[in-house]
C-alpha cells in the first residue's frame, strides 16, 4: 500500500509517493531538523490568534490515495481504503498515550499515532468492499471514502469525547 506526502514550497506543491509502512516507520523517528518538536514548542508559547511558521514545514500525509501532478492539477493514481479519524484536544501526553493504546487494541485499527501538535491522536482504519476489492476511479473512491468514514466513526468508543472524523479526500 502506498500514500502521498504533499508539501507546499512557497506556492509550488511537491508530491511524493511512499510505501505506507515506510512512512509509519519514518514517523516513529523524528528527523534531525525536528519539525514536530519545534511545532509543539511553538504551540506551547503561541497566542491563540498567531500563525505558526513551523506548520508550513510539515508535509501533509494523504493516507487514502496516491496522486500525481497533471497540467490542470492533480490526478489520483491509486486508492488504498485508509480512513483517518482524529481524537483532538487531548490534555497531555498521558491522555494521548491512553487513546493510542485503546485504539491499538481494536482489531480494525491499522495504525494510531500522536498528531504533530502533541494533543491529538490520528487513527487509520483500512476498509475494503466485501470481496476485498477497492474502487479504482476517483469518483467511486470518493463515495466509498465518505461511506467508510461514517462507518469508521461508529467503530470507536463513545468515550472518545473529542472524536472528530476527518475525511481524507480520495
Residue ranges of model-derived segments:
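DNA replication initiation on ssDNA origins
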Residues: 1-81
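Short connector loops at helix/strand junctions that flank enzyme active sites
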Residues: 78-80, 107, 118
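Histidine-centered divalent-metal-coordination microenvironment in nucleic-acid enzymes
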Residues: 85, 110-137
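Short, surface-exposed ligand-recognition loops at beta-strand->loop->(often short) alpha-helix junctions
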Residues: 86-95
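Helical (often loop-to-helix) elements that flank the catalytic cores of nucleotide-handling enzymes
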Residues: 99-102, 127-160
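Conserved small/polar residues in nucleotide/adenosyl-binding loops
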Residues: 161-170
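Conserved alpha/beta core surface patches that mediate binding of polyanionic ligands
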Residues: 100-110
Amino acid at each position: 500500500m502506498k500514500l502521498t506526502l504533499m508539501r507546499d514550497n512557497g506556492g509550488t506543491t511537491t508530491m511524493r509517493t511512499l510505501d505506507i509502512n515506510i512512512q509509519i516507520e519514518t514517523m516513529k523517528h523524528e528527523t534531525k531538523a525536528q519539525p514536530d518538536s519545534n511545532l509543539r514548542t511553538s504551540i506551547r508559547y503561541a497566542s491563540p490568534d498567531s500563525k505558526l511558521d513551523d506548520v508550513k514545514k510539515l508535509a501533509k500525509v494523504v493516507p487514502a490515495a496516491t496522486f500525481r501532478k497533471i497540467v490542470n492539477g492533480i490526478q489520483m493514481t491509486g486508492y488504498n481504503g485508509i480512513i483517518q479519524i482524529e481524537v483532538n484536544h487531548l490534555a497531555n501526553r498521558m491522555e494521548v498515550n491512553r487513546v493510542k493504546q485503546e485504539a491499538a487494541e481494536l482489531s480494525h485499527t491499522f495504525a494510531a499515532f500522536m498528531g504533530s501538535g502533541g494533543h491529538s491522536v490520528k487513527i487509520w482504519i483500512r476498509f475494503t468492499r466485501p470481496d476485498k476489492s477497492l474502487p479504482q476511479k476517483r469518483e467511486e473512491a470518493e463515495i466509498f471514502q465518505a461511506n467508510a468514514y461514517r462507518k469508521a466513526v461508529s467503530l470507536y468508543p463513545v468515550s472518545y469525547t473529542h472524536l472528530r472524523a476527518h475525511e481524507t479526500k480520495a
